[in-house]
Amino acid sequence: MRANVQGLMSGELGNWLTEQQTMREEAKKKANNRWFYSGIAALPVAGFILFLPFDLGFFRYFLILFLGFGVFAWGYGPISEAKKTIKVGINSAIARDLGISYSHDVEPGEEYEAARRYGLLPSYQRDSQEDRWFGELEGHPFNLYEAHLEQRRGSGKNRRWVTVFRGAIIDIGFGRPFHSTTLLQRKGKHKKWFGLGGRADHADFGGHRLDYVDQVHPDFEGVFEVWSDDQVEARVLIHPTYVEHLIELERVFDGDAVRALFRAGEVIIAIESGNMFESGSMNAEDDAAKVAKTSEQFAAMARLATAINQNERGRVIANETRSEPAPAAPQSPPTGPGGFGRKGL
């Protein structure tokens, strides 16, 4: 599932991007003016703080730094808005070409709460979401967006926000019926004795108990653990052939911590893929590359969703919709935290 980048750039999207050149230039000019005049205004304020007759110690440098950050942020505002306009235009055009929809703003739903409850996401104190892609994928309801989760760490002057998760949350209707709740989690997530002992026999998720499901494949047990409230159905969902596929999937997304929750007829996937879909640029010559990169990033996410999904016979949907049995490497893997997409699917 990949957009026709060449067709988009030679058609309506390319024409629209050409029309945005004036907007880009005006945004740059406005930003430069803001930086110039606010910088002039900030200089005497910084001098006053620096040469106060009483000693503020280190705090005076913090005030000057805060003043400089304020000048930069205010000046960058027009550029930020221009890049967002370009990004929304490009991503919306890619989505239309794929027959789905795109929205920059996201209102997380039940899938987000389920991902939190069952441990697909780490604990956090601040979160934000953006870049929602939704519609149908291989005939199944599909919803994807990015999440950025942070925790406050340190103390005193070393107190700071630290990213604990930045990646994609994918919610897709599963291709075969099931009634249980089954969790595919990273190895070692749930242990006895407050995390100090060996693997637990069961885990509690907000009052919902899931029991450990034995898997005989040593390579699988070295990476994943399966937890479920229905041992029989869990083994039907994660059967021997599917286990082999999950091992290959982990190899393809090496280091990106794929995990999934099967519940209520759908599968919810979390993957630490970094910051994606940033197609907005102030330089028109970058547009074609940005469109191609964003298109490939979404295609890789779609391949991941179909690679985890199954049809009614328990076969992987991705294998049903292509002739090659092996994953195909992406043409231009995206960059960013977590190294997502190095080998593609």
Language-model segments: residues:
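Hydrophobic alpha-helical transmembrane segments
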Residues: 50-67
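Hydrophobic alpha-helical segments of integral membrane proteins
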Residues: 42-46, 50-51, 72
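Cytosolic juxtamembrane N-terminal segments of multi-pass membrane proteins
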Residues: 1-32
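Charged, low-complexity intrinsically disordered regions
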Residues: 32-37, 92, 96-98, 104-113, ...
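Transmembrane alpha-helices and immediately adjacent membrane-cytoplasm interface residues
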Residues: 64-88
